[in-house]
Structures are given as C-alpha cells and as structure tokens.
C-alpha cells in the first residue's frame, strides 16, 4: 500500500544561509525563515527569476516568498536583487533600509516605490550615473500621415494597414516644423504624444481619433509622421530619498536622480534628493534631481532638492501636462527649468506644453530661481517664491509665461525678467522686494504687469511695451517705471500705464524715458496714476538731443492737497491758488507740459458763459518755491458771469 503525506512538514530556519543551503525541500513543505527579513516560503521546481529577496535558488528548485502587498528592501541580500525584482511591471517595493546603488534601478509600468523614514538610496560610489529610471522608448518605425493635420484637430490619418493602432495605444507624432513657443527654437522640431480613443478605416485610409487636440500643424510638406512608442505608465514614487547630507563628504555623484522618458502618469511625492555640489559652488557634475523628457501627465509634489548641480525639476522634449507643487529647492542652478534639447548630436523634437508650478520655493540658486529656456507653451507659475538668487528670481525665455501671486526677494538682477525677443509675459498680483536691478523687467519684448508691487530696486518696472495696470511701487532708487529697451534691435510697442500708485518717498522718479535706446514717449499713455509728491520732477529723461513730445496724459495726480475746490466767478473771472504745475522750457531731456484743470459748473445763472483756464503761474520764491502759491485763472466768455465752478487739477 502507498504512503501518502497528509501533513506537510514544517521547516524553520534561523538564518538565510542555512535555508538556501538546505538540500531536501519538497513541494509540500511549509518553510519559515525567522528574523526581520523572514517570512513564509513555498518550494517549487518550476524555473523562476531569482532576486534573492522574493525568489531564492536552492538545491533542486526555488523558494518563493509568500506575501500579499509590497515587498521590502530588507528582504533582499543585495542591490542586484532589488534591480531584478523591479525589472518586471506591476511591482510594489518599500525601501526600509539604506541601499548602496551599484547600478541604475529601472522601474516599469504599474509600479510603486515608496520609502520609510529610514529608507535611503545612496548613489553609486564608482560611477556617476542615474539613480532611478522610468524609461520607455521612441518608436522604432514611423509611417507618414496620409493628409495634413491642423492644429486643434483630434484626428489624424494614415494609409490603411500602415499602423497597428488600437484604442489605448500611445502615438508619437513629429515633423520637421520648428517649435514655436519662444523666440529661439535651437533647431528643435515639433512633436507630441497622444493616446488613441478610436480607429476606423474606409477607402484605404485609417482615421485615428486622439484623446487631445494637436497643438501644431502637421504638414506633409514637413514630413509629418507617426509611430508607436514604448511607454512606461502609472508609476508612483512615494517619499523617495536619494543621498544623504554629508554622506562621504558628498562625493557620491549622480547625473540624474530620477529620470523619466516616454512615461505617462508618473507621480512623485514627498521626496528628498541631495546632490553633490558644495554649498554655494558653481555647476558641477550632477545635472538634475528630476528630469521629465517626452512625458505626459506627470506630477511632483512636496519634494525637496539640495545642492543639485543644475536643476531641481527639468522638463524638456514634448512633455505635456506637467504639474509641480510645493517643492523646496536649496542651492541649485534653477529650482525648475523648462528646457530645450541640444541638437549638436542630431535632430531633436518637442517642447514642454501645459506646465503648472504651484507653491514652489527656491533658495539661494546659483542662477535664476525659476527659468523657462527659450521654448515651451502655456506655462504658468502660481504662488511660487524665489529667495536670494544669484541672477533673476524668475526668468521667462519663452512667450506668454504667466505668473500669478509669485514673489521674488533679493535677486542679484531682476526679480522677474524676460529675455531677448520674448513677447509679453503676464504678471498678476506678484511682489518683488529688494532686487538689485528691477522688480519686473519686460524690456526685451514687452509685458503685462497687473496689480503688482516692486519695492527697493533700482527700477520698479523696466518695460518697452504692453501694460502696467494697478499696483504699488516704493523705494525704487531711480524710477518706478523705466521705459527702455535692453536690446537696441527690440521694437518699442505701445505702452499703457494706468492706475499705478507710485508716490514720491524720497528716492527716484515716477517714470524714466530712455532716449539713449530710442524710446519714443508718444507711444506711452499715462492715466489715473498716483504720483503724489513728485511735483515738477515726476519724469526723468536721458539720451535725447531734442526735446521729445510727452506721453499722452490723463487724470494723473502729482499732489494730494491743493488739487480740488470751488471758485465763484466775479465779473466772469476767478484767480485760484492751487497746485497747478508745468514745465515750459525747451531743454532736450525734459518734457514741455502743464497741469490739466477740469472745470465743472455748479450753478447756471443767465449770465453763464463758456469757461476756460488761463494764466497758469508757478511761485518762484527763493530758495524754495511754494507750490501752494501757484495759481490759475478761470475765465468766462461772459464778463457778467457769477457762476460757482468746481475745479480739479490733474496731469
């Protein structure tokens, strides 16, 4: 009679070495390893990938760890085993130990990597390389479009059978057309990643419906083509911690902390990434803490960066819908950099589109706190702050960047700046404090400055066109608004200055017009501005060889007293002491101007005539003229007029 084992024997081991050396495991065995890295195992003779954490090779077969939920780094005997475990998709690993990286850790689709308070990854001691990779790949085969696809379209066409696209497939479109987000494309060509939502074929042509509209025109004349990339999808990194302060005197170099390429739905939160740069030193090896290249729907939240050679978060290629929230970057080149790819080693495609930075902070950056490098579209920063940057606080080098309620403190150059050829950044409710050159510099291509404040700079706003509306400016040593061009070939455009509070506070002029750079004041309009206290000296001019025509002026205030009242005409005339002012000379670097006096008749006697202002006179007392003794005459066309007339003085 055959004997049948009814109860599997229990095999308990106190250490890993004795367990993996045991020679007599059988399939039914119940196997237990004691200790912090212990657990329950099953034995199998089926070939399995060994990672020395969840799968061990033993005599005659393999031990498989029994677990539900994440694996733990403390289970693994070495870094190579962790790399092996994470090389497959659908993985969840908790880093609960200090790991010494000896190679790149590649993370695949549908995976999560999270760190406990004691979990760390220390960069490779021997080779400077990336630490964590979420890397897909570009298509290996492209097919041409069957027809032009216009910007705004959500449909492309290819020849029937040319592309094996089905619902859910990612597509990578590109052409030889150049990116258009900024003034200098550096030769980078257009590209986008889209997802297929439907496919239909008729008459030898396959129509592919896309999840989002195209941002560019894809023309056959520009060799527009499409392929299927390999995307890494749905990856989450929770509290990633790379390197340590003072670890081996910060000599553990890495090129990129977390590198993503052709990835979708990548989310990084609450991390710490420490670079190798000595405090305050210039750029060194170690480009970026986090790099997104050709990624879609990515987020970074609550992550800190220290001593990074270049960038905290770098976004380039056709990355789209990237959001960065609540990061803190200390002693990096830029906290956030939207970048172009170098074409020195061949063609490159794609610019960042739809980028949003919210509640981000940059401290002591070696260059601008936040930068957009020449290309990119629909870029926005909200409630971000730059402190003590060695260049500008914020630098816009692509068109139409929008800043909402951001702040710049003590930048070595401008608090907020654009660059050559950049058109019309938008600033709303932003604050600039104690920046060396200016609070806002829009003098490279114009800009819009709405309800902002600048205090303690040489100039509050440098600008050559656009609009400055609302806001408050104080303690700016030369001027509150400097109308100039930082580059001679930049075209001056019309400029509206409206409703700005720029009272005299002991330093600087309200406005400065830079004739040296060819500024034409007639392209400027100034209205409803509070320039109280500046008096005759509200404007500074330089570089003009003949007296220029002043800007268009309306309802500006130079004083807060002696500027309104009521006069009663006697025999059709009244002399009024008021703070009327004017400059009647013809000196080149000055404007010829006189106060505007608005008259409103309050009574209407039968003798009422047409009212005019004549004989504006300024007190000439020496050494200090008294503006309260300035005067003007209200005169009626009817010498019998005895009307009461309200008067208001403006510039």
Swiss-Prot record:
Key word Lyase present: yes
GO cellular component entries: virus tail
A GO molecular function held by the record: lyase activity
EC number: 4.-.-.-
Site (Substrate binding 2 and important for the adsorption and infectivity of phage) residue list: 472
Keyword Lyase in annotation: yes
One GO BP: symbiont entry into host cell via disruption of host cell glycocalyx
InterPro entries referenced in this protein's UniProt entry, alphabetically: K1-lyase_C, Pectin_lyas_fold, Pectin_lyase_fold/virulence
Site (Substrate binding 1): 130, 291, 314, 339-340, 373
Name under which the protein is recorded: Depolymerase, capsule K1-specific
Biological source species: Klebsiella phage KpV71
Species classification: Viruses, Duplodnaviria, Heunggongvirae, Uroviricota, Caudoviricetes
């Amino acid at each position: 009679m055959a004997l049948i084992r009814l109860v599997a024997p229990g095999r308990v081991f106190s250490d890993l070495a004795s367990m993996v050396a045991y020679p007599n495991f059988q399939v039914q065995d119940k196997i237990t390893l004691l200790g912090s890295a212990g657990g329950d195992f099953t034995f199998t003779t089926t070939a399995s990938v060994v990672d020395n954490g969840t799968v061990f090779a033993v005599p005659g077969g393999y031990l498989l760890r029994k677990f539900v939920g994440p694996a733990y780094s403390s289970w693994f005997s070495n870094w190579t085993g962790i790399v092996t475990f994470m090389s497959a998709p659908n993985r969840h690993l908790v880093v609960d130990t200090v790991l010494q990286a000896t190679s790149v850790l590649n993370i695949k689709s549908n995976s999560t990597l999270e760190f406990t308070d004691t979990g760390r990854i220390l960069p490779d001691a021997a080779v400077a390389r990336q630490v964590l990779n979420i890397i897909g790949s570009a298509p290996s085969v492209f097919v041409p479009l069957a027809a032009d696809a216009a910007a705004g379209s959500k449909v492309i066409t290819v020849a029937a059978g040319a592309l094996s696209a089905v619902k859910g497939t990612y597509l990578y479109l590109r052409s030889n057309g150049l990116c258009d987000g900024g003034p200098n494309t550096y030769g980078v060509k257009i590209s986008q990643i889209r997802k297929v939502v439907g496919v239909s074929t008729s008459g030898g042509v396959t129509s592919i419906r896309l999840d989002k509209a195209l941002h560019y025109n894809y023309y056959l004349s520009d060799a527009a083509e499409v392929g299927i990339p390999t995307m890494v999808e749905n990856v989450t990194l929770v509290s990633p911690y790379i390197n340590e302060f003072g670890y081996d005197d910060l000599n553990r170099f890495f090129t990129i902390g977390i590198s993503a390429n052709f990835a979708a739905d990548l989310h990084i939160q609450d991390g710490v990434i420490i670079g190798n740069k000595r405090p305050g030193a210039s750029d060194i090896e170690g480009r970026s803490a986090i790099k997104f290249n050709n990624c879609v729907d990515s987020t970074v939240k609550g992550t800190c960066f220290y001593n990074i050679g270049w960038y905290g978060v770098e976004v380039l290629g056709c990355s789209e819908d990237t959001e960065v929230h609540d990061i803190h970057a200390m002693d990096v080149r830029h906290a956030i950099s939207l970048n172009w790819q170098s074409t020195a080693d061949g063609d490159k495609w794609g610019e960042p589109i739809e980028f949003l930075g919210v509640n981000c902070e940059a401290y002591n950056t070696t260059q601008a706190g936040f930068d957009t490098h020449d290309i990119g579209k629909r870029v926005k920063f909200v409630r971000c702050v730059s402190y003590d940057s060695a260049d500008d606080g914020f630098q816009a080098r692509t068109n139409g960047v929008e800043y909402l309620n951001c702040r710049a403190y003590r930048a070595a150059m401008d608090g907020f700046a654009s660059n050559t050829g950049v058109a019309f950044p938008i600033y709303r409710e932003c604050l600039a404090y104690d920046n060396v050159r200016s609070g806002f510099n829009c003098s490279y291509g114009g800009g819009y400055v709405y309800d902002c404040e600048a205090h303690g700079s040489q100039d509050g706003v440098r600008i050559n066109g656009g609009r400055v509306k609302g806001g408050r400016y104080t303690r700016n040593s030369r001027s509150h608004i400097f109308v100039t061009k930082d580059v001679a070939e930049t075209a001056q455009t019309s400029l509206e200055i409206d409703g700005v509070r720029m009272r005299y506070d002991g330093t600087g002029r309200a406005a400065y017009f830079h004739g040296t750079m060819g500024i034409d004041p007639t392209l400027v309009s100034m209205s409803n501005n509070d320039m109280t206290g500046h008096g005759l000296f509200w404007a500074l001019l330089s570089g003009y060889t003949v007296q220029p025509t002043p800007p268009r002026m309306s309802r500006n205030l130079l004083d807060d007293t002696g500027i309104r009242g009521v006069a009663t005409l006697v025999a059709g005339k009244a002399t009024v002491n008021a703070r009327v002012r004017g400059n009647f000379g013809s000196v080149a670097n000055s404007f010829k101007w006189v106060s505007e006096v608005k008259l409103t008749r309050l009574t209407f006697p039968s003798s009422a005539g047409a009212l005019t202002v004549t004989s504006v006179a300024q007190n000439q007392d020496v050494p200090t003229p008294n503006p309260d003794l300035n005067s003007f005459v209200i005169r009626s066309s009817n010498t019998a007029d005895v009307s009461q007339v309200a008067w208001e003085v403006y510039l």
